[in-house]
Amino acid sequence: MLFRSRLGVPVEDFGALARLYELENLRITGVFSHLCVADSLTQEDRYYTKKQLERFYCAVDWLRANGYNPGRIHIQASEGILNLPPQPCGYARAGIALYGTAGNVGDGLRPVLSLRTRVACVRTLAAGERAGYGLAFRAERETRLAVLTIGYADGLPRSLTENGGRVLIQGQFCLMVGRMCMDQLFVDVTGLLSVHSGDIATLIGQDGSRELRVEELAQQCGTIPNELLSRLGTRLNQVIC
């Protein structure tokens, strides 16, 4: 069984570790590794994680026994924090968990990030009329479409509108339709006659008693929350509450 990281030193190559400490212009202040399947609770993956931990601490012990100071050690990222007991390390790398998610809705975390935009305008289409690039949306009946001021240039996956993406407006779920544009997208607000320009639309977060979680968006796009949240662009205004 091999335990090789993307960029690090093979754990069994103690000589390479020693040579790093002997570099004149390098001051090592810490040693770390990364658990590649800490998000999985299958028996096979739990065993793999256990062996990774054992190998890591073996390398740390070797350094200490041979007079090399490993400094601060760390190996747990968010999933490792949630799925493993506390480790004898100096740090834990809580990344995605700081947003209140780590990939599973049932992990007990409370989301702290919301993504909202506004309605630019509302258009009424007659039955048979089309809207958007490629004329991708066709109104089967008289339909009210709200145009939202957010698009794929802000980091949203373009596939979201094609895979059942939703928003919350006035506490009600509204389906995304047509093709997402660079700066805008359409949602069907036919049943919400009071929706008008300036209304807030929630893509991630709560509106009234309903909620849209980033895990749902990720599942619809065939990806993970980490990717979606890291894609959110600098064009978005950030409000810290």
Which ranges hold each PLM region?
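Active-site loop/helix belt of alpha/beta enzymes
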Residues: F3-A126, L193
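C-terminal accessory subdomain/extension
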Residues: T124-C241
